[in-house]
Structures are given as structure tokens and as C-alpha cells.
């Protein structure tokens, strides 16, 4: 019978790409991990890893074993959590959440507050994180819940081994200086804003890609992207103080932003989906956190 500890080591090596990376993460020596994996290969009766330069990758047999090992290890984690909850008489455990900035403020923080009242024995640890980092961290059990985003026309990678649930959908709104001539209308044609300087996230981000695409496809122009920051609050301040424009989601704007005009594009709806990503097997504590995030998300977007 295969040892769960060795299966965990195999999954860690697969996730990190090197024996040395797994050793650093787990606090073992590389030789100790190599010895344990050699035993696992003997138990499996076939090679599980092959070297590619300085890295290692799974053989076909290794891929089969890691897939089943993930199911087994997630099941063990869930069983241990349920036993702890039964022993305590209530849901308990540590749940680690990752989220992008605006969801952290509008969804995660309110959910943590409600969990403190409803489930005081759940310890929530939360960090700002981009969704690209989430899937490996979820598989390696470094993260339990990820709140991610997906702009229209820019689909995220599909992870069939993880569970994705819809949380909310936001509008992307045009944010202008209050005294801009187009701010007088309820809806603003993007084409009328070709002469504006713009503030957007850094190159290579989903927001930047969305911004360029909207200006090109709806407005017919190449935007003058003069200001860059991955902090949406900085982008709002740049609109307020420099006369720039921005395209920002509802979660950033909240119930309103003083000193700026917030309008919908006249050409039609542009949006962003916000979703929850977890392992397929959820502990009672993770399920409680997911429920709290869903409830907080239902109240997070403005009624305008």
C-alpha cells in the first residue's frame, strides 16, 4: 500500500518543478526527498519522474498517480477537519484566502467580519493575491480559497481539478473628471474620449488588456495610457487630480467616488466576473468561508 506521506512529496515536487524547491518548502533535504520518491517508484513498479534540464517532470504514470494522490490527500484533509469539528462541537480550522485588491476590500473583509460572529473557531488568514498564482497554491494546500476575476472576452485558464463558482458580475464604468464635457450625459460614448490621457494598470495585466481593447473596439482609437498603477485607488486619484480618464469596475468605485463622474459606456455593457476557486473537496470550515464570501458578494456592488 502506498504511503500518504510519499504521495504528498510527489505532489509537492510536481507543483514546484524541482526536488530542491520541494525540499525548501517542506524543510527536508533534497536527498531525503529523493530517497522517499525512490521508494514510491518501487512501490508503484514504474518510473514516476524524469529529469528535464535542472527540473523534473512527471512521467505518464506519475501524472496518473498525482491525480489520484490529490483526491486522496484532499479527502484526508476533509476527514481530519470534520473530525475536529465533531470533537469541538462546531466548525473550526484555519482557512487561507487569496483575493485581488477590490474584492479584498468589498467582499473578503465583510465576510471575515461576519465569520467572526457566526464561526468564531475559524481562523481566517487572507492575503492580496492575483489569480494566476492561485491554482498552484490551491493544489499544494498553501491556499484554500481564491477570489478571482475575469474580464469579458479575456477568459481565465480552466482548471478541471478545481471548483469554480460565480460570485458576482460588475459593470466596467467610465470614470471622468467632474468638469469633463461628456460627464453631463448618463452614458458616455467611448469615441468621444479619444483625446483624454488615461490611467490604467501596468502592461501585462488583465485590466490593461481590457482598457486597450475597449478603446480600440468601441472607440476606434489607441488610448494615450499616460499613467500606470496596479492600485485602483491610485487610478481613481489620478482621475480626480490630473484630468485623466479610467475604466474601472464597480467594486473599485463602491457606492460612489467624490470628485469624479462615473458613467456607463454608451456603446453597451462591458463587464467583469468575480468568482470563487477552491479544491473540489471542501472542509466544513472552507465551506463556511465560501458561504460567507457568497453572501458578502451579494451586497458588494452598487445599486445604480
Question: Which positions does each model-derived feature cover?
Answer:
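Short helix-boundary/capping micro-motifs
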Residues: 12-29
Amino acid at each position: 500500500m502506498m504511503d500518504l506521506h510519499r504521495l504528498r512529496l510527489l505532489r509537492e515536487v510536481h507543483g514546484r518543478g524541482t526536488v530542491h524547491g520541494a525540499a525548501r518548502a517542506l524543510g527536508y533535504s533534497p536527498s531525503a526527498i529523493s530517497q522517499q520518491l525512490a521508494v514510491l517508484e518501487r512501490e508503484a513498479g514504474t518510473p514516476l519522474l524524469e529529469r528535464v534540464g535542472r527540473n523534473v517532470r512527471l512521467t505518464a504514470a506519475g501524472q496518473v498517480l498525482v491525480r489520484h494522490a490529490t483526491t486522496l490527500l484532499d479527502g484526508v484533509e476533509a476527514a481530519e477537519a470534520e473530525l475536529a469539528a465533531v470533537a469541538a462541537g462546531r466548525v473550526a480550522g484555519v482557512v487561507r484566502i487569496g483575493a485581488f485588491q477590490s474584492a479584498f476590500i468589498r467582499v473578503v473583509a465583510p465576510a471575515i467580519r461576519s465569520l467572526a460572529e457566526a464561526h468564531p473557531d475559524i481562523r481566517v488568514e487572507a492575503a492580496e493575491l492575483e489569480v494566476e498564482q492561485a491554482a498552484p497554491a490551491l493544489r499544494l494546500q498553501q491556499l484554500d480559497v481564491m477570489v478571482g476575476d475575469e474580464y469579458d472576452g479575456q477568459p481565465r485558464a480552466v482548471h478541471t481539478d478545481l471548483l469554480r463558482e460565480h460570485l458576482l458580475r460588475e459593470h466596467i464604468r467610465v470614470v471622468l473628471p467632474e468638469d469633463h464635457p461628456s460627464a453631463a450625459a448618463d452614458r458616455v460614448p467611448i469615441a468621444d474620449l479619444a483625446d483624454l490621457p488615461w490611467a490604467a494598470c501596468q502592461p501585462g495585466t488583465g485590466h490593461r488588456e481590457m482598457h486597450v481593447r475597449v478603446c480600440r473596439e468601441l472607440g476606434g482609437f489607441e488610448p494615450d495610457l499616460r499613467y500606470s498603477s496596479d492600485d485602483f485607488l491610485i487610478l481613481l486619484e489620478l482621475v480626480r487630480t490630473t484630468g485623466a480618464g479610467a475604466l474601472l469596475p464597480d467594486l473599485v468605485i463602491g457606492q460612489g467616488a467624490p470628485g469624479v463622474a462615473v458613467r456607463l459606456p454608451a456603446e453597451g455593457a462591458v463587464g467583469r466576473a468575480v468568482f470563487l476557486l477552491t479544491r473540489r473537496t471542501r472542509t466544513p470550515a472552507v465551506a463556511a468561508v465560501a458561504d460567507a464570501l457568497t453572501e458578502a458578494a451579494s451586497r458588494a456592488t452598487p445599486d445604480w
